[in-house]
Structures are given as structure tokens and as C-alpha cells.
Amino acid sequence: MIRHIDIAVQKIFEMKEKEPAKFKKLIDEGIMIGLGVDLGDRSREEYTAGHIKEQSRPKDPDYAAVTEAVIEGDSEETVRLTVALLEKGKDPTDLVLNALMPGIQTVCELYDIGESYMPEILLANEALIGGVKLCQERIGEIRYEGKVVSLVIEGDLHDIGKNIVAAILRANGFEVVDLGNDITVEAAVKAVKAANADLVVGTTLMSTTKEGLKVLAEVLESEDVPVACGGAAVDRRFVETFCNSVYGKTPLDAVKIAKNICAGKSWKEVRNDLH
């Protein structure tokens, strides 16, 4: 007979493999309890999907409907509701900050605890973009934390990870110029100059293409635009072999890098802090 402890261990390892975010939360909470820190009911409650949604829901019911549409990844409904509110005279900047952004932020927080997945983030991101574009038409430029160019380097067509990073950067207040996948160094440099970007986030899933990130970082050094490098084929050791680059293992690392670069830190300072 299999003991209960064996079943529990098996399930824990399955969670680590299939739901790493949820596994991390479990481990973090377990460590705190082991150290004698009482998390209390409220702390545990904050890890639940229901609590996260409740905390992010705007008090204004019209705004809450927009937020929910973004969470559900319903682009058509998001656009319809945004148009209706703009026609009612709602401030477009306020709509972006307090109706649209809470939606994508909620989905990203749910992803962090293993309660949402890549397809849901991508759908929410599309819904967000649809609403933001409508608001931009009314107000012109929206003030962002900074401008980031996002891309998958030449030779690699895999862009799911890049899309996740772009969505989470947008959720944290950054303007993202998404170039897509299979982007040459020349095209990337041209786009960076045209956008006057603060940072490039470059990813690749393939070891055969990762050298392109090195070339891009070296070329952009003269433009004083660093490259945050990530993806399955990239690790810290590789990134530290060339200048003007910082390694990010997770999408949230990209946010940390962007915030530090846009705050005026050099790539060397950011690398020293985060590596």
C-alpha cells in the first residue's frame, strides 16, 4: 500500500513541474511557518484568486465592467464598454489607469499564484491594447514609466514568452513597442532609434540564435540602450560574457530591469544588483 506521505510527495513534485508559480507560493508559505511566523488567515487569503479579483475591482460599476472584460480576455466587450464610457464623457486617462490597467494587473497576479495561464494573459493583453488605443485617440500621448522595445531575435519564431513579458511590462506602466519574432539586429536598431527606447527586451528559445542577442547588445552600446536578455536558451553565465546586457529569468525580472534602467541606473549597476 502506498503511504499517504508518498502520495503527497508525488503531488508536490507534479506541482513543481506543472505549476511552478503555485509551487513557489507553497514553499514560501511553508518556510515562513517553519520559522515560526504566523501568517494568519488574512495573509493566506491574499493568495486566493477571489481576494485578488476583489481587491482590484474598481468601485465604479462601469469601470468594474471594463476591468472584468479585460480579465476575461474579451476584446470585443472591452472595446464596446470603453467606447460607451468615452461617449459619456469619461476621462480617457482615468479609464486607462483605473479601468483597463487593473484588468491586466489582476491576470498577472493570478498568473503569479498559478491561477491563470499564458493564453489568458495573452487574451487579456489583446483586450487591454484595444481599449488603450481608443483612449489614446482621445488624449494623444499617455505618460508611461518608460519605453521598451520587445522582440524575439532573428531565426526564432517562438514568441509566447515574449508576449507574456510584453503584457506584464504594460501592466506595470511601460509603453511596449512589440516588433514580433525573427527580428534582425539591423531592424531592431532601427526601431530602437525611431522609438527613442530606454531598453530592449530580447528573448530566444533556441541556442542556435542566442548569439544574436550578444550582437544586438554590442551594437546598441553606442546608443546607450541596454538589452534585457531572457528565454529558455539564455542564462546568466551567457549574458555575463558580453557588455550592455542584463539577464532576466522571469517576466517579473524584466519589470525590475526596466524600472531600474528608466530610473537612471546603468546596465552595470542593474546587473550587479540583480545577478
UniProtKB/Swiss-Prot annotation:
Any one GO BP annotation for this protein: homocysteine metabolic process
Entry keyword set: Cobalt, Metal-binding
Protein's name in the database: Methylated-thiol--corrinoid protein MtsB
Positions of methylcob(III)alamin binding: H158
Intrachain disulfide bonds: none
Domain B12-binding per the UniProt entry, residue ranges: 145-272
InterPro entries xrefs: Cbl-bd_cap (IPR003759), Cobalamin-bd (IPR006158), Cobalamin-bd_sf (IPR036724), Met_Synthase/Corrinoid (IPR050554), Meth_synthase_dom (IPR036594)
SUPFAM superfamilies: Cobalamin (vitamin B12)-binding domain (SSF52242), Methionine synthase domain (SSF47644)
Membership in a protein family: Belongs to the methylamine corrinoid protein family.
Pfam entry (one): B12-binding
One Gene Ontology cellular component: cytosol
Role noted for this protein: Harbors a corrinoid prosthetic group and acts as a methyl group carrier in methanogenesis from methylated-thiols.
Residue span, B12-binding N-terminal domain: 53-147
Gene3D superfamilies registered for this protein in UniProt: Cobalamin-binding domain, Methionine synthase domain
Molecular functions (GO terms): cobalamin binding; metal ion binding; methionine synthase activity
